[in-house]
Every structure is written in structure tokens, then in C-alpha cells.
Amino acid sequence: MAVVQGKSSDVFNILQASLNYLDQGLSKQSLPYLTGEAISVADVVLSAALYPFLSDSSLALGEYKSLKAWFDHVAARHSFQSAAQKVLQGKGLQGMKSYMQRQPLPQSSVCRDSQPTNNGTPAECDEGERMVSEEEMEAAALTWCKGLNSSPLVKERQHPILPQEDKKNILVTSALPYVNNVPHLGNIIGCVLSADVFSRYGRLRGWNLLYVCGTDEYGTATENKAREEGLTPQQICDKYHAVHASIYKWFQIDFDFFGRTTTEKQTEIAQDIFWRLNKHGFLVEDTVEQLRCESCQRFLADRFVEGICPFCNYAEARGDQCDKCGRLINAVELREPQCKVCRQTPNIRSSKHLFLDLPKLETQLEQWLDKSTSTGDWTANAKQITRSWLRDGLKPRCITRDLHWGTPVPHPDFKEKVFYVWFDAPIGYLSITANYTDQWQKWWKNPHQVELYNFMAKDNVPFHSVVFPCSLLGAQDNYTLVNHLVATEYLNYEDTKFSKSRGVGVFGDMAKDTGIPSDVWRFYLLYVRPEGQDSAFSWADMALKNNSELLNNLGNFINRAGMFVTRFFEGCVPAMELLQEDKKLLAMVSWELQQYIQLMDKVRIRDGLKHILNISRHGNQYIQVNEPWKKIKGGETDRQRAGTVTGVSVNIACLLSVMLSPYMPTVSQTIRDQLNAPQSCISTMFQGTGTFVCSLSAGHRIGTVSPLFQKLEVDQIEALKKRFGGQQPEDEPPKKKMTAQNAASSPPAAVPTTAAPAAEVATANGADPEKAKLLTQAVTEQGDKVRTLKGQKAEKAVITAEVAKLLDLKKQLAVAEGKSLEPAAPQKSKKK
């Protein structure tokens, strides 16, 4: 320290250069920590190394503003201060080790170096058990013993929901689904389901939250659908609005209001915004070239033109945007355009239109974006897509179209035109709210009191982050703009895209006919939610997650906990006397709960689900090691121990019922009904950063316990996969199965230079690849279980039994892979 303060030797110069470099790097990012929104090992290690310098007030650190702000942010944490005190008291590394053990792993327990699996979910981390300090154990036990407090119950909603002075007011929207498209699984997870989970979570947190959505009903697609079905556009909208509402009801999407855009309120509000933009000089006229299909006798809407992208050469780019490179396109820029209705080549015609002057609004937009993206929770893809738009420079955007079915343009020079859907549709959020309550402006013209969350897939980002905000900024009417823009990547189906026409993939109106409960669908879609990259729905993986995570992990733990109370303690929760092992479990569960709340607050929905499953895994191991079914038959000490383990376990089950509520509402309620759980446990558990307390005290009588989940069988999954896999083209003859006989009579083929794929060889040997995939996961999980038991030094009999199960699973796997199980011929001994 003296060397630094005296500024002698080269050490100070090296340190100063390093601090400069670090400060510059921190100043270029909007994240509070080195690697993201949550504190990581990198923050801990670096802040610990720099602690002697950065905590010394005598050093002139004012020039390192970003570095100082980062260090103050880390140092403000109570656990850091505690660890620092231990360093000063001579505990050195041990103090810092204790601090590091308390912190969440980078990216919420996801291994940085692990490679993503095919469905986009993180690969499992091969990490040891998290260390728990003595202080954590005692703190968790103290909190646990306080029990349920007198916090106010989560109130039932009373409509209309309006902003309140003393509340956190959250307005949630999900992208309006287009009315005549039946949503597939990717549409559902990308918008309404993700928003539903966050909304349910927010209500449990006690936030004053309003969730609105509805069908987007104007445009050419509706006109064409009406012509196909011999109905009017309004009749088509009425018909398919009901279809959407029915699908979302089955998926348990809990809107506060589900409306539509074909309303008088839509016309009123859209035309008001239009006149305000016109008044403030943000609209310009121009003559544009459009594509007109002479065969269909109409100008073609952008989405009814398809051709080659002029930027990336993608062959199926739409007339407004390329799905591959994400660039916006004018339809006339497409190479080799085709009308999607009749497949004829359209002609170019001129027409006069109105444009939103985006370049004139660009400065206002950038100022707002800088603030919103730095203070709000925008997903990385939303930020990236928005930056790319600004980097390329904004251009005037056409807001009118030569159509009949739409919100009419009120300007006398354009009375034959309607508003373009991407100017008109986002205004649907406002009009839908206005149809919910005549006090809608308290939500939409109240930016200082309301936080707005938009949920969507990534292709909708530019219209919500650039076009719509520019419309509202230009209107200059104190509109509420998006604070948190949450965009998913794409969910594919198996190894291809969803296609209604080809019968490929599961669509919303089909899911309920599979016999699989909606909660299981919700769970799996959220488990593979495409948060950081595209993911894929897979039947085999869905069965695997249902059978391993829901049935064998979560359901197994909750059912065992409840059944022990019923069988061993006559349905009443037994008395509990906590040992150190119990306190350790309470600390681990409390940490998982805190991580869950931290992630859910940041809309990290998929990662939040992993912490629920971690808790049930801890619970299963706890039961397995303590064996209450054996101890209940022993002496007084053993019976007391069985009671404690059972009581702690059933309380963890109660906690899980609360944490599951946003994801699996029916299962959550079923668990609470089985446990006869008090309503106050919800508000208590979700207080602050998360509070795990004893909510089912000794003497509490539970209800009837029954299994929560059913196994998905291989033959059931195979039938569903075939049903939703599409059909072979009729003109394609069925492939002839090769046998030894017809192989001999076939003409000689070229000799392959590589071996046949393993899957083909396995199939030829009578293998079952799908079953093999399920069994591979089962073998992995059973192996983990055996290793855990060995590490915990469980009884030899228990380990032997689990090893036997592992060996049996390996035999089943060998059969499924088509491997021979015949024992090798014994070698003759050389001894006489």
C-alpha cells in the first residue's frame, strides 16, 4: 500500500494502466456487473483483489467513475462487507471463500463452458454440492422457526384494475396474435404463455398488475380468409377470435382482459394519434411503387409477397421483412417476387401514401432508448436488433395501405386507404385496455407510475422498439413507453418448422386432443423456452422431461412427503427437532428460493424453473439418506428423527406448490389442496428476496395425498410423433425395405467409404432409438444418484440396491441399442 500511495516503482504505473483499462470497459456496458445482470465469480475475485486499493479513501479514484460505481455496487452487499471484515480480522482467504459460496453461480447455475443441447437448454453441469456456511445454516433455521407471519393475503383481483399510488404498478402485454392463424406451440411460448407466467408471478409478489392481450384482426390476410370461406371479414374475425380464446383458456392463460382490434375504440385512438403526428410535422407524403397482382386484381400486402431477399439471398423473404437476416424490406426490392395467393408474378404500380418520418424522430428515440435499455430488463436479442436498426439509419416508414379491411385513414386526401397493420396493431394494446376500462389513460398516459412489459418473439422487436415508440413520442401526449422488452428466439418442431398445411407440428387446437394435461404442456414449453437461442420441441425429450423431472423428481418427492405424514403420523404433521443436517437443507432450499425470485424478477423464466427442480432434488436426497420409513420402526430417537425428516419434507413440498404456481397452476393448486396449505404461505414465501418458513406446523392436518403425474409411455409418444409429423408426398413411392433376398438381386452399388450411421445399424439389430434415448437419461440420473449416496456415505444396503437398479437400466439400454447380451465364451484357463 505504501508503494502505491508513494507512487514509487513501476507497480503503481502497472496498476494505474489496469484500472484505466477496466474503467473504460465498464463505461461501455450498461450491465451492473462484469458478466451480466447478476453477480458472478468474476466480480467476487476481482473486487477481492482490488479491495485494498478501492476501499482506501485516501486514493484519488474520482477519475475512475465507472470502476468506482461497480465496486460500490458489489461492496454494498451485506455478505461482501461481512467477508471483508473477516479479511481485516486475519481470516484472509477463508473469509472471501465464505462470501463466494453465498453467491449465485454465473448465469444462474448454468455452466459457462457447457455446450447447449439440441433443444437450446443448457447442458447439465457436473459440479459438486454447493458449500453452505455455518452462518447461513443458523440464519435459515432462525427464519424457518418464525413461521407464517401476519403479512396480508394475496387478494383476489377486483376489476377494473387501476394504478395505485403506493403500489408497484405493472402493465403486461403480449404480442397480439393474428386472428386467422391458429397459434402453434412456438407462438404460444413466445408471447402469451411467457407473459402469463410473469403475470402470475407478479401477482404472487403483491404487485398491482394488469395483463392485456387480444387478436389483431385487420389486414389483407383476413380479407382473403373471408373470401376462401365465403364469409365477411367481420364474421371471420368473430369465428377465429373465439378459436383463440378457447385455446388460451385450455392453456390456462390468465388474461385480465382478452380483446380485439376491430372496435370503435381502436378507430378513435388510432386516428387521434394520427392527427397528433400530423399536427407536429411527423408525417410526410410520397408516391411509392407497389406490387399489384393482376390475377387477384389487388395491391398485395407485404405478407402476401414472397421472393429472394436482396440482402442475404434467402429464398422465402416476405414483402416487409426477411426472417433469416431480420432486415426490413420494401416489397418491390424482392428479387423474383411471387403472389402467395396465386403464385403469379405481380407488376409494379405507383400509389400516393403517408409516411411516419422516423429520421425526424431519431434523436428523441435514441434518448429514450438509452434510458429504457439501461434501466429496464431488455433481452439481449431485443437490444441487438434495435441497435442494428439505428446503426443502419432510420428511414421514413409507410403507414397507409390500399386495402378495405382496416382502420380508415381520416385524412380527406387518403380516404380510400386504411392504416398499415404495423402502425395500427400496436395501438391495439391501448384500445383493448380502453375496452376493459374507460380509465385506460391511467395506465397508458402515466409513465412515471407505470412499468410496461412487452412480450413477443424476436421478429416483432423492431415494431415495438422503434416504430411504435416513435408513433407515441411524436404524438407528444405523455404516453407510457415500454420499460422492459422481453423477446424470445424461435421454437422449432423436431428438426423442421411448424406447418399447418403440411400437418407438421402441434397447434393450439390440437394439444388438448393428445391426452396430455395442459400443465405438462406448459412445463415442457417453459423448460425449452428459447431464451438465448432457438430451441426445438421434441416428443422424445418431452417424454424424458415428464418421466424424469416431473414424475421421478418433483412428483416423487411431493408424494412421498405427503404419504409419510398419512401413513406414519395419522395425517398430522409431526413435531420437528432440527439437527445440523436439517439446517443445512433449509439453507440450501432458501438459497434456491432466493435465486428463483432474483431470476423471475428479471424475467429469466426458464432458469427460474430449474431452481424448483433443484429443490425437489435436494428433498429426494434428504429423504433417501435419512430413510424415515425405517426409522419410524426404531426407538424413540429414531421415531423422532423420522418425524423431523417428514415434517421438513412436507414443508418443502408446500414451498414448491407456491413456486410452481406461475408455471403449473393446476398442479400447484392440487398440491396445496392435498396439503391443506394455508393461503398465507403464498404472501410470506414471496416477501422480499424470498422467505422459507415452516408453514405447516406440528399438528397441522393434511388432506388426501395422491400421485400428481403419469408416465408418458414410449408407444404413446411414438404414435403422437407420427400423428404430428406430416405425410409423405403422394407422388413419392414408399421406400422399399432392404432384405437379404432383394439385396442379393439388386445391382451392385458403390462401396461406401464410411460406416453406416449408428442409428441405422441399431435399427437393423432390432433396436428402439427412442426408447434408448429415454433409457440413456435414466442411466445418467441413476448413476448420479449412486454417486451422491456414496459421497454421503449412505448405508451399504441402500447403495447396493441402487447399484442393482443401475445395472438393470444399463441392460435395458443395451437391448434398446440393439447390442447382444450373450455372455462372451469363457477363456480356457492356462492352469492345469
Describe the role of every protein-language-model region.
Residues M1-Q85:
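GST-like fold's C-terminal all-alpha helical module
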Residues V110, N119-C213, K265-E268, Q321, ...:
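Structured secondary-structure scaffolds
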Residues P530, F537-N546, F564-G608:
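Long, amphipathic alpha-helical stalk/connector segments used for oligomerization, subunit docking
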